[in-house]
Structure formats: structure tokens, C-alpha cells
């Protein structure tokens, strides 16, 4: 039983840095590709008046629901936003980051 608990603890400890790395990667990707218009962090205003702050996206819809759109290509209803399509590994990192910054 002690070995099982030790192994479970080791798995959790090994997963934590990967999760933190995903969050950081997601932040980097969004800052690079979206930060010109959207507020990407926990504070600040979006530079474009119609671009929602990413920390408030969870108020509109579940963050997980963005997974398909991020992987297949995000298209907006307004012409100022270019289409973005992310690789599968990047989508997971972006979702992890977005979840980490949502405000209640």
C-alpha cells in the first residue's frame, strides 16, 4: 500500500511541472498571436474595443468548448480579426492557460 501511495505521489509531482509548462506555453502563444488586440493576462484592457479580454471568456462559454475552434481555425464575425489555427499540442496549452486566468 505504501508503494502505491508513493507512486501516485510521484506521478502527481511529475505532472505538476508539465501542467505549469503548458500554462506558460499557452500564455506565450496567445501573447504572440492575439495580444495585439486582446487583453491576454489577468489584468488590463484589450487594445481593440471589440476584442474581449481572455480572462472573461469563461463567462461566455465553457473554455473547453474552444478546443475544436482553436484546432480547426478561429473565425470571427468582424473583419479585423485574422483566422488562427493552432497545432494540437498548442491547443492543450492554450486551454490550460485560459482556464488558469478565468475570473469568477
Give the predicted meaning of each segment:
Residues 3, 20, 27, 87-88:
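Short, structured coil/loop segments at alpha-helix boundaries
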Residues 53-99:
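Extracytoplasmic electron-transfer domains, predominantly the class I c-type cytochrome c fold
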Residues 1-9:
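Bacterial N-terminal signal peptides that target proteins for export
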Residues 21-50, 72-79, 101-104:
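Periplasmic/extracellular electron-transfer cofactor-ligation site
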Amino acid at each position: 500500500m505504501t508503494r502505491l501511495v508513493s507512486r501516485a505521489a510521484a506521478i502527481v509531482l511529475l505532472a505538476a511541472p508539465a501542467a505549469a509548462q503548458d500554462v506558460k506555453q499557452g500564455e506565450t502563444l496567445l501573447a504572440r498571436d492575439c495580444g495585439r488586440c486582446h487583453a491576454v493576462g489577468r489584468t488590463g484592457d484589450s487594445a481593440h474595443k471589440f476584442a474581449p479580454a481572455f480572462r472573461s471568456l469563461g463567462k461566455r462559454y465553457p473554455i473547453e468548448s474552444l478546443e475544436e475552434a482553436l484546432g480547426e481555425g478561429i473565425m470571427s464575425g468582424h473583419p479585423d480579426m485574422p483566422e488562427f489555427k493552432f497545432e494540437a499540442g498548442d491547443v492543450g496549452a492554450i486551454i490550460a492557460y485560459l482556464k488558469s486566468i478565468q475570473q469568477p
